[in-house]
Amino acid sequence: MGTILDKIVDQKKKEVAALYETYTPVKEKRKTRSLVKALEQFTVIAEVKRASPSKGDINLHVDVRKQVKAYEECGAGAVSVLTDGQFFKGSFYDLQTAREESSIPLLCKDFIIDKIQIDRAYEAGADIILLIVAALTKEKLKELYSYVLEKGLEAIVEVHDEQELEIAIQFNPHVIGINNRNLKTFEVDLSQTEKLGKRLNEEKLLWISESGVHSKEDMIRVKRAGAKGVLVGEALMTSSSIHTFFEDCKVNI
């Protein structure tokens, strides 16, 4: 029996095959917005997340335009959009809708295994592509990272443990994302940020913390560990007031 990640990657292979049958990448170049610049000060990357394998439906019928507008008005430094349909109920249409509404950097949050997915994300308006070390061979990661650069985009290279971190460091990526969620079990442990953050601070690399941040205390914890930003999804998608959440999570350390 495979892990959740195995099942997701198997589904992605089917989606990639379908994309090659139905989608022709556009050749046009466009301007992009920089997450690296946004991370010059500690910032929140606010996520549009309808559902997840671990939580089921979170906010299935969210108004993406309204949500993204609220994120930007409340001071988010970037917006992340889940584009996976099978497991997270997202879509590239959600990404495109977010682009139409937002003037800040936009992350395509998906399980990228092929260049054609990057082409599709680029066309939908992404500025940043998530590359997950756990989902890729080292050779494929190198190929996709190079393609992200070729497209004029930025990458977040995501890691969960020391072994993945050592692979990511070799690429000297724009941003490293420490995912506190184990994608094989979907369990969350915020201490991963503190463990792996020490190594990244030594290397003087730009990094963010992903998953498991629900409160001001969590925000303080990851900032003290050295993170330059934090990706928040579920907590914002279930909040009765996005404005109040941002106010509560303002940290000055």
Swiss-Prot record:
Extract the NCBIfam families matched here: PRK00278.1-3 (NF001371), PRK00278.2-4 (NF001377)
Protein's name in the database: Indole-3-glycerol phosphate synthase
Keyword Amino-acid biosynthesis carried by entry: yes
Which Enzyme Commission numbers does its entry carry?
A: 4.1.1.48
Q: Which SUPFAM superfamilies match?
A: Ribulose-phoshate binding barrel (SSF51366)
Tell me its family.
Belongs to the TrpC family.
An example GO biological process term is:
L-tryptophan biosynthetic process
Q: Name one Pfam family in it.
A: IGPS
Question: Could you say which enzyme class this protein belongs to?
Answer: lyase
Q: So, what pathway does this thing act in?
A: Amino-acid biosynthesis; L-tryptophan biosynthesis; L-tryptophan from chorismate: step 4/5
> Is Amino-acid biosynthesis among the key words of this record?
yes
The organism is Bacillus cereus (strain AH187)
Q: Lineage in the entry?
A: Bacteria, Bacillati, Bacillota, Bacilli, Bacillales
Q: Which InterPro entries match?
A: Aldolase_TIM, Indole-3-glycerol_P_synth, Indole-3-glycerol_P_synth_dom, Indole-3-GlycerolPSynthase_CS, RibuloseP-bd_barrel
Known catalysed reaction(s)?
1-(2-carboxyphenylamino)-1-deoxy-D-ribulose 5-phosphate + H(+) = (1S,2R)-1-C-(indol-3-yl)glycerol 3-phosphate + CO2 + H2O
Gene name of the record: trpC
Which keywords, in A-to-Z order, does the entry hold? Amino-acid biosynthesis, Aromatic amino acid biosynthesis, Decarboxylase, Lyase, Tryptophan biosynthesis
- What molecular functions are annotated in GO for this chain? indole-3-glycerol-phosphate synthase activity; phosphoribosylanthranilate isomerase activity
